[in-house]
Amino acid sequence: MQFDYFYGSQAEQFSFYRIPKVLFTDPQFKPLSTDAKVLYGILLDRMNLSVKNQWLDEQSRVYIIFTTEEIMEALSCANQKACRLMLELEKDAGLIERKRQGLGKPSLIYVKNFAVSS
């Protein structure tokens, strides 16, 4: 298959996941796998939907719901890898926090803002 070039404003025709450059440049995040960094970008993107839907907890913190199955679909990976990447973001980097809801409901995911220290 041969692809054509971009012409003029065509370069703006796609939507993109935004991954903060600091995840690649800051020594604190160097140990994170590239897949975990990509997943963080996907989770940040999902936050836009949560903001539109006003998914806020009692402390006005934005949360997302993104199941393991959705991660597997987004990254074309197996369950084990999806779970490992979430653990990497949560335990190793502290970039997300999960809150279990119980009763078979998916966990709430808080995507952390690493640019602001609390």
Regions found by a protein language model. Name each.
Residues 47-111:
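Winged helix-turn-helix DNA-binding recognition segment
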Residues 115-118:
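Charged low-complexity intrinsically disordered patches
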Residues 1-69:
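Short recognition helix of helix-turn-helix/winged-helix DNA-binding domains
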